[in-house]
Amino acid sequence: TAAGLTCFQVPGVPAPVQDTAPRTGERQQQEQVALAARDAMAGQLMGKLMQTLGSAGPAAAIGVCREAAPQIAAETGKKFGVAIGRTSFRLRNPKNAPPSWADPLVAAQPADPQFVPLPDGQLGALLPIRLKPECMLCHGPKDQILTEVREALATHYPPDQATGFQTGDLRGWFWVTVPAGARSPGTNAPTSANEKL
C-alpha cells in the first residue's frame, strides 16, 4: 500500500508516546518488531529512491514509489509477519489511505511514535516520516518543483495533495499492524530502532 514519493528520516526515534495499556514483555516485543519492520522497509525504499534519483532523475523516482514500494511493503510484511505501509494526512496516492485503526491518529497528526492495542492481541504502530532536503524535489512548494516532475505527478497522481512541504515537515507515517506472538527475524540479537537509513 505504498505508492507516493515519500522520503524517509527516522530521527533518533523519540520515546514512544505511551497509552494506558501495561507494557508486557509481549507488548515490548511487538513494538520492537514494528520498529524493525519500519527500518527494513524505509532502508530498502530509500536506497531504491536514491539509486533512481542518481541514475534517472526525480521524475523517474516517482515510479519507484508507484511500482517498487508496494512490492517492498509486501516483502517486508512477509519477512516480519506484519502488515505494513505508509500513509499521510495529505495523500499522493489514494491507495495509501490508513488502516481503520489508524484513522483517528492520522487525523490528530502525531509527531511522535504511537502504539495502539488492537483486538486479538495485535498492536498497531504509527511511526512518523519527516522530510529530508532531497525530498523537496517532489514534495516541496509547487513553484520550486521541476516542470518534468510536475508533469509526471499530474499524469500519475491527478488528485495529488503531497506538495507544499518544507524540509523537516511531518510528511506522514509508516503504519504497522503486528500480530500477537510476532518475533523479529533472527532474534538472536536485539532489534535496533536506530538503524541509520
Feature map (PLM): residue ranges:
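Short Cys/His-rich local motifs and their 1-3 flanking residues in nucleic-acid-associated proteins
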Residues: G140
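Extracytoplasmic c-type cytochrome modules immediately beyond a signal peptide or single-pass transmembrane anchor
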Residues: C7-E134, D143-L197
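Bacterial N-terminal signal peptides
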Residues: T1-G4
